[in-house]
Amino acid sequence: MTVVHPIAAEKYLSWIDPEDGSIISRRRSPKRGRVRDVAKELYWLSDFIGNPRFSLRLLLVEMEEYRLADGWSKDGKRGSNRYEIFPTALLGDVTLTTPADYADYFLPAALATPDQEGNHPPFTAAVYAKATGVRGRATYGTLHLLEKLGLVEETEEKIGRSRGYRAISRHEHA
């Protein structure tokens, strides 16, 4: 089974005048979609991820969004309504199948690299969030997924008042 999920890698916004339907302005959105942006959706797929018959295909697409300039601000943009959004180009794709694929995108090298003694230092969810840019509840969902895949484990000891995690070497879970 393959699940396909689009990621808006680039987006263009066009503003429509609600009076006559003409395009007022068009600009490129500063927001860029990344593979890690799907972290919050992965929690709901965690029962399937890790199964050799399951793969997740992420499509990096260019999107065009049209919004009505009917908002409450002077230019009508704040609180405006989306009129339509659709993909205009496929910029690339990423297929995640094996635990190593997920490690490449969701487990930063700084946290997965062992120290000089060969031990993986423990880290907290906050350290993981800072290293990856995954925020909020998605942080814990992603760590749960990485645990299920055998890439990280929860440590016995806490770090301050926080749970500790550590990366597992490939030979430890093989």
Please give the residue ranges for each predicted region.
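Conserved catalytic cores of phosphodiester-cleaving nucleases, focusing on short active-site segments
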Residues: M1-V4
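Switch/connector loops and helix/strand junctions flanking conserved nucleotide-binding motifs
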Residues: E10-W15
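Long, low-complexity, charged/polar intrinsically disordered regions in eukaryotic proteins
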Residues: S25-D101
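Positively charged, polyanion-binding regions of nucleic-acid-associated proteins
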Residues: T97-G118
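A short, conserved structural fragment
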Residues: E147-K158
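Short, cationic-aromatic polyanion-contact patches
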Residues: E157-A174
